[in-house]
Amino acid sequence: WQRVCEDIQAGTLQRRYRGDVSLGIPKTVPRQLLDKRQYVTAHATFATMGCRNACRFCSIAKFHESRFFTRPVADVVAEVAAFDSPFFMFVDDNLTQDRDYAMALFEGLAPLGKRWITQASLTIGDDEALLAAMQRAGCTGVFVGLETFNPDALASQQKAFNTPEKYRTAVAAFHRHGMYVEAGVMVGFDHDSPAVFRETLKSLE
């Protein structure tokens, strides 16, 4: 933004800017300024930003150009430790995409005894060690993008790594580790028929 402001003052504003992303936060966010009545929780933070996947429907892939960034684990843990609440939310796009980073983060969070929710990929449903680490760290819920039960629709959106036949076992794995699952589902793909609503509801049940 410094360069943008300088260009405005100089009358040389460019049509587009592309900069490196820094996830360093120089000081604690002044959460006391927030009206907590207006939020599910005023204690929301992030450890990572972006996602390496390139799902066609997702703005994150375009905005971050399928890049993935991480904050220092120690910074995240220190921020969470300072929360005056036993509950908080990670607003990360895909918190567990870097497994080694996620494991280090969960190890750092575990001693704090806080509870939290996040977004993650359904593909971690077969990683028992990672799920166990999430549980120890206090994770109680995840939002995952099922998107659709139609493999052709998934392939058309560059999300063929989602496999509908594994949905049930993946969700069950989250449940075994004490996490509720909020599923993101979409309809209206070119491969869908008018029956998609009934079929999707039946599959979810």
Predicted regions and their residues:
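C-terminal accessory regions of radical SAM enzymes
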Residues: 13, 195-205
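Glycine-rich beta-alpha loop elements in corrinoid/cobalamin-binding modules
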Residues: 1-25
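Radical SAM [4Fe-4S] cluster-binding motif and immediate context
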Residues: 29-182, 187-189, 198, 202
